């Protein structure tokens, strides 16, 4: 069965991405050699030939390229992650929404690399899918699978000749569950550790963001006020790339991952809210505007872990 995604008009720059497929090795004509490997923190690592990928459930996305529409068909990125099965450590078994800790890093031609939070891709949360395209307008893409992200504003996260998917899982240390109200937020990026006080966060440029999402009791609508996640990272002197992931940790040790690229390229605001519906929050809240479900909203944020490539 072919699943059809919502048609999206992309910037004309997509033409450059399509043109970039020229050159490099083509598919083996018989399709007998693997063209894609899936590994990392998975229960079942796998390699796929072109024919094996084509035999998986297919989805289509219609986009506009240079004023003309093209239709890409292939495998949803999340399908391949689900098939491999994230290998959660014992400490995360039976953890609420453990899928929201999972990332997948896509690598292609010229060592080009892009990381996604699986929560962004999942239809129950972010509902912003990515597609490993195998054909375009019914014709096989000659030089191997191409990653396309139909909902993005521009083809910045598109990856030609994809050869490797690496799954990662954000495993963060337990937080202090009894901090005082207005405790600072700790930003941890490897050996780079920055403390952002409540006063400093309050001085950062703030945005007002009306949001709506599904919660346990139905649709919730709020007005959030606070700095964007990009502004918070800049305050910590962190410059994100397309491979950067961020894991927000709440007072209850609830964790959800996002990527700055969701806002930079996908146009979906990410915010560290300090005020909700006119009431100051005791601790910041991660807000993921555009998600259909509020699972990636993290209340009482005390720690923010930042990494590049597969989460760990």
Where does each model-flagged region fall?
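Secretory targeting and sorting signals
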Residues: 1-28
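N-terminal intrinsically disordered, low-complexity segments enriched in P/E/S/T
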Residues: 2-3, 27-312
């Amino acid at each position: 069965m072919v699943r059809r995604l919502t048609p999206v008009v992309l910037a004309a720059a997509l033409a450059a991405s399509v043109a970039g497929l020229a050159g490099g090795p083509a598919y083996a004509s018989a399709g007998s050699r693997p063209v894609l490997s899936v590994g990392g923190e998975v229960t079942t690592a796998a390699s796929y030939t072109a024919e094996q990928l084509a035999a998986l459930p297919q989805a289509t996305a219609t986009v506009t390229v240079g004023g003309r529409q093209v239709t890409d068909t292939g495998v949803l990125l999340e399908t391949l992650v689900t098939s491999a099965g994230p290998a959660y450590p014992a400490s995360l078994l039976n953890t609420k929404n453990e899928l929201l800790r999972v990332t997948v890093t896509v690598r292609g031609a010229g060592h080009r690399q892009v990381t996604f939070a699986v929560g962004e891709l999942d239809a129950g949360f972010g509902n912003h899918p990515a597609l490993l395209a195998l054909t375009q307008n019914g014709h096989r893409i000659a030089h191997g699978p191409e990653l396309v992200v139909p909902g993005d504003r521009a083809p910045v996260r598109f990856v030609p000749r994809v050869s490797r998917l690496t799954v990662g899982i954000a495993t963060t240390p337990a937080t202090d569950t009894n901090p005082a109200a207005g405790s600072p937020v700790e930003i941890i990026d490897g050996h780079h550790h920055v403390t952002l006080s409540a006063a400093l966060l309050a001085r950062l440029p703030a945005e007002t963001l009306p949001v709506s999402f599904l919660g346990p009791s139905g649709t919730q609508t709020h007005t959030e006020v606070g700095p964007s996640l990009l502004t918070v990272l800049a305050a910590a002197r962190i410059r994100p790339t397309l491979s950067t992931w961020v894991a927000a940790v709440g007072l209850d040790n609830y964790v959800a991952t996002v990527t700055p690229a969701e806002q930079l390229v996908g146009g979906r605001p990410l915010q560290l809210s300090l005020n909700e519906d006119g009431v100051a929050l005791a601790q910041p809240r991660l807000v993921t505007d555009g998600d259909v479900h509020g699972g990636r909203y993290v209340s009482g944020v005390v720690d923010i872990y930042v990494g590049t490539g597969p989460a760990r």
